[in-house]
Amino acid sequence: MEISGHTRLLCLIGSPVAHSGSPAMYNYSFEKLGLDYRYLAFDIKEEDTKKAIEALKMMNFRGCNITMPGKTVAASCCDELSKAAQLTGAINTIVNEDGKLVGHITDGTGWIRNCLEHGFDIHGKKLVIAGTGGAGTAIQIAAALGGAKKIAIFARKSSPRFANGEETVRKIREHVPECQAEIFDLEDAESLRRELTNADLFCNATKVGMKPMDDQSVIPDVSMMRPELVFSDIVYNPRETKLLKEAKEAGCKVIPGIGMLLWQGAEAFRLYTGQEMPVREVQEQYFSE
């Protein structure tokens, strides 16, 4: 489809963005469905995020994705936030609804959909989630809103981000009281073992397992891995982290992180266009080994 005066524009903003596969994935999907959209990427430093979003609004862009480091700043630029975005305090997607900028966070919904695609439904389940950074917080909030029964959050007490986890627990207790939420020190192996004993799923939402930490795992002892426990990792490079390799060897079902990347993009696509991304074709084209 040729670009015309009617073509709606979308983009990715953040820094760096040159490596991003988003433009290829979205433009392929638009072409596949015959939609008159184009998707670009702009390298925008955190301090310029507000100006960039104002410019996109002025030029009537349909919306944008935000990657690091501007996710928190971007939330403050919106006229309205989804419930998950309000509680997370950050966004990765803005949709321009006739001049009103609506902020969304699709990281958590992408993770939930990835779990579903691997046969795991979080509803009514107990989840143990390590990590209190942006992705971890988004997953914890989305899981609480999505019907998880209990969420045990683990983070290193010595880290400044432990306070993020405490704040997430407070928000879940206040806004989603039907979901039990607690936080523990990740360096307390006994607490981790105890919480895993009756958990349904463990998720690594830290950078452990990613290079240069690809020889490490957040689970210090493989005896904590019982076959009934599902293991999820948000790290997608390498595709099979040490955590997932050891979990598989212990007879556990594993959920690799690459699917979360795909499904968070698919959710943003739906918000932009009102249509479903051609996920199977995109998966084959851009996410196959």
Where are these regions (language model features)?
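Phosphate/diphosphate ligand-binding glycine-rich loop within oxidoreductases
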Residues: E2-H118
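Short, conserved loop/helix-junction motifs that constitute active-site signature segments
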Residues: I3-S4, I122-H123, L145-G147, I219-E228
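Glycine-rich adenosine-cofactor-binding loop
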Residues: G14, I105, G124-L145, A155
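Conserved S-adenosyl-L-methionine
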Residues: L145-K150, A250-K253
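NAD(P)-binding Rossmann-fold cofactor-contacting core
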Residues: A148-V176
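Rossmann-like adenosine-cofactor binding region
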Residues: E178-V254
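Adenosine-phosphate binding glycine-rich loop
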Residues: E228-V230, I234-E289
